[in-house]
Amino acid sequence: MESHGDEGEPSAMAKPPKKLPMSRKGFGTRGQSIQLLTNHFRVSVRRMDGHFYHYHVEVKYEDGGPVEAKGVCRRVVDKLQETYASELAGREFAYNGEKGLFTAGALLQTKHQFVVVMEDASSSGRTTTRRSSGGDDGSPGGSDRKRMKRPMAVKKFMVEISFAAKDPMSAIAEVLRGQETENSMEALRVLDITLRQHSAKHARDTASCPSYPSAMDGWMKTGVPKGGREKISCRGFHSSFRPTDSGLSLNVDVSTTMIVRPGPVIEFLLFNQNIKNPHEIDWGKAKCALKNLRIKTTHTGSEFRIIGLSEDTCYSQTFQIKRKNGNGGSDTVEEVTVFEYYRKNWKIDLKGSAHFPCLNVGKPKRPTYIPLELCHLVPLQRYKKALSTLQRSTLVERSRQNPQERMFVLSGVLRDSDYNSVPMLRECGISIAQEFTQVAARVLPAPKLKSGDGEDIFARNGRWNFNKNRLIQPKRVQRWVVVNFSAQCNAHHLAQRLIHCGNLKGLPVDPEDHVFQERSHMGRERAETRVNDMFQQLLSGDKPSFVLCVLPERKNCDIYGPWKRMCLVKYGIVTQCLAPTKINDQYLTNVLLKINAKLGGLNSLLQIERNQAIPLLSKTPTIILGMDVSHGSPGRDDVPSVAAVVSSLEWPLISKYKASVCTQSPRLEMIDSLFKLVGNEDHVIIRESLMDFYNSSRGHKDGVSEGQFNQVLNIELAQIIKACEFLANEKNDSEWSPKFTVIVAQKNHHTKFFQTDRSNKVVNVPPGTVVDKGICHPRNCDFYMCAHAGMIGTTRPTHYHVLHDENNFTPDDLQELVHNLSYVYQRSTTAISGVAPICYAHLAAAQVSQFVRLDDAASEGSGDGGAPPRPVPELPRLHPDVRQSMFFC
């Protein structure tokens, strides 16, 4: 991944020596020692003397067209191995379903060509034909008939296998020593491909459904409910080999994803849009929902992938078809409608979809149209688009497994998968233990907190409250108003309850100046119109300093984005949105915590923070940076990403932050505009933070994969260093050279920990649990931490990677700092799973992305691959009155 910055930014200058992730200095010792189990399984490797041979595979249809479906390719290659075992020297191999095939020894020749005849060549294992533009498969739109001369159930495939490279098996030993070379990572990749191939075959052999979600290594039948929505959850599992400081291990975990409910396409659209009459279908939304899904036709059994919809209805949509001249003359071209074609050629009188658009399953310049009523969605297709609030909550609910249940399921997965019987693994001398790995862990004590009345607050099980304590730095709420977009909420009563609760917590809340109710006729207007109308009422008097906004619904409310933009960009008004369903003291307290933080107050402080006793940080002026990137909804690769950097304020505090944001290219995880040599200071995202600070820095980054660590060090850190040098030149201070510590936090991993209590029941690990040996990297400095209490499901630890440390933290000091940063999150009275700066960066990026409703702009189109990339729009600047605030809290 490259930085796509302007000419003159650091990546174009003379490059310093390439930085690599630092090696481990040692292990932590603080905390109470405990023993845990983890979902890693020990792997023994008895053979290191051979080579993995890498071959390039081309699978083609008889006419030379490439086969693109992974499922078809896998079945063809399986058939090839069965048919041509002697020509392949009896070799077992691992095939990735695309272009890569790996063996544990050389084939007889460097290049092989085979013809494979399949009686059942669909990706689902059922009879089908290749997608054709011709009318022979029941899909009008072309004249290609060659592939239909052979009986439908029999297909010929041409397979070419050619030598590409070889890697020594001894490379596995290198990666276990922490030497991550290209050869060593390739060797592990071969082993992972072997597992995926085994899981794919296992799924085909045992499942009644024809395919499985490609995002998971396998899937487990949990039953498909007959009623319900257009998307359902599907439970599968993930497995991968991991190098650790105690040897090679296999990480196995349960995964859950949303899949599209199989069945008639029209029923799917009715469920998707929550309507009962097909004539009410919004076809713009339908096009977006259906794109790239696979369907099977009821009249031929053929499978296709949807690329869009026809412009006209089935009754009116025309296409050209060639008619052969029986007298030997030239062919004639006739233009017919899809409706007429099916009536004449297939004797099908279309009734249910004659006046609806057709599905286009062809190519952009060569469409192939099929009526909706003849199409069924095939099973087990992963839903890759954005989920609604209800769908997300359903997925979370279905994903939850308590530790006891998860361990039971994982034991079953390992037993049923029977990896030790996989021929390729046996040929490589690899065996996998069936027992969960035991690891040593430590539990760090919760830090003490200080309240406004001088009392110590003791967190128990990662939680505390303000029932008997006051906020430590309350900010008076004055000159404030309530705006009410909800017809269900009594805003006057809500304001009175909020005032009463605030006074109990030591947060003085003046009586509200006014409650503005939305005019009754505005409810059906566009969100922007409703917001503008409300602001006309709001600004009829003096500008308030704070606005409490009551929304009509929780999450994904159309009003939220325009309202936030108007308040924070145009007028500089601090605002808090809410959509209460049940108002009680705890709910109001949580709202007040957010309001106080946004107005510049603090709810609590760490005792060591107040006493300036944090190792290193309290002695040397320090800024803590948190970085995150918010991407568009799944399936929206044409939507710009929003990057955010939050920086700590008022050293020696580590509890107060501000944010800077910018847009960048879609799906780009690296922040490519931390520093650029451009004239407009507003474009330099890191400059604002550095102008407030003039010494050493600690940085925390989220959402980065292990393969991107070098980019964090050599792109992002390099830009920050260059920004510091530029600022030092501006200040004429050649001696200013801050020291950096860079830590990456990963949540998207599959490691889980389990503890057995006195009654021999498997439970979640206690908050403050840290693991830095046994399953960590063999060389690099990393550790797992569960700072929070897992109340529901199985606790997911955060995996921290210390990439760079010029401040020379001890392992204990660094782990305690990370633990402490999980207790300074001003929005709640619980320890959080990550560190507060990263969570704030995530909130800032997600909130600011709503200002311009980027997803709405993209929802009209479907991001066709042939369209030129859109220019990245700039975000509007925050109003100066809120720029330094924790507006994102």
UniProtKB/Swiss-Prot annotation:
GO molecular function: RNA binding; RNA endonuclease activity
Listed GO CC annotations: cytoplasm; nucleus
Gene3D superfamilies: 3.40.50.2300, paz domain, Ribonuclease H-like superfamily/Ribonuclease H
InterPro entries for this protein: ArgoL1 (IPR014811), ArgoL2 (IPR032472), Argonaute_N (IPR032474), PAZ_dom (IPR003100), PAZ_dom_sf (IPR036085), Piwi (IPR003165), Piwi_ago-like (IPR045246), RNaseH-like_sf (IPR012337)
Pfam families named among the record's database cross-references: ArgoL1 (PF08699), ArgoL2 (PF16488), ArgoN (PF16486), PAZ (PF02170), Piwi (PF02171)
One BP annotation, GO: regulatory ncRNA-mediated gene silencing
Biased composition (Low complexity): 122-132
UniProt-listed SMART domains: DUF1785 (SM01163), PAZ (SM00949), Piwi (SM00950)
Disulfide bond residue pairs: none
Highest taxon listed in the record's lineage: Eukaryota
Region feature (Disordered): 1-26, 119-150, 857-878
Occurrences of domain Piwi (ranges): 546-853
Keywords per UniProt: RNA-mediated gene silencing
All residue ranges annotated as the PAZ domain in the record: 264-379
Biological role: Probably involved in the RNA silencing pathway. May bind to short RNAs such as microRNAs (miRNAs) or short interfering RNAs (siRNAs), and represses the translation of mRNAs which are complementary to them.
Similarity section: Belongs to the argonaute family. Ago subfamily.
Protein name: Protein argonaute 15
